[in-house]
């Protein structure tokens, strides 16, 4: 459960600006997610469930892996996000992706899935263990569960040498914590899989490092999306100075240090539903 003990909520909202941030973010981490899914065994002809689809990036990635003979069903509870996801899929020409508006614990399904995937979804759920159990019931015996979730501890540690960058990522972290997100859920996936009745997952942690302006812009844009929650959680952007110039000041700090800065650590975990468990 989240360290704060509150019920988690998606703290980043569903504005057009947040959608653009998600699309950019996905473009940077897509190779890591694709490698995870390939290693998990997701491939041509499979029927795959994508949890918390957002604006559709993971669903479209999986659609390429399963090919025209496969199918991807994305589940998302936010109407605005689903509309954007559907528009993007239509524009891409992919015909093997559909989206349904639903809570992840209330998915209706008559045909078992071959796999269930998700990225940055379990961290925001009030009971990720219950969600994993629920989703597992929708899979065929031997089906794959593969998730990409965050671990903020290395993100904070590797930012400590830069005062402004450290203050910025610490504010992101504190806002998510107070909103109820489990910011270290990546390292908790082993326990969650086991308690869900699944074999211990194969796991890996990866951290992207860079120093380009787009990377520092990501921090600014994440703080912008968190703005309402920052205020609601009695935190403040004021210690960071003029918010409009934050990207330039962050980039100047990184350049002056002649070092790189991290993206949040990504923990990938995947396992198979036991053969003797039949779908419900």
Which sequence ranges carry the predicted segments?
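N-terminal, positively charged/glycine-rich alpha-helical extensions of SAM-dependent methyltransferases
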Residues: 1-19, 24
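C-terminal helical/coil "lid" or tail adjacent to the Rossmann-like core of SAM-dependent
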Residues: 11, 15-18, 200-261
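Conserved alpha-helix/loop element of class I SAM-dependent methyltransferases that forms part
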Residues: 27-46, 61
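Class I SAM-dependent methyltransferase SAM/SAH-binding core
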Residues: 49, 55-106
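A short acidic, Gly/Pro-enriched loop at the edge of an enzyme's catalytic core
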Residues: 106-115
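A short SAM/SAH-binding and catalytic strip from SAM-dependent methyltransferases
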Residues: 114-128
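A short glycine-rich, Lys/Arg-flanked "PGG" loop and its adjoining helix->strand segment in the class I
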Residues: 129-144
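Conserved catalytic/acceptor-binding region of the Class I
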Residues: 146-214, 229-232
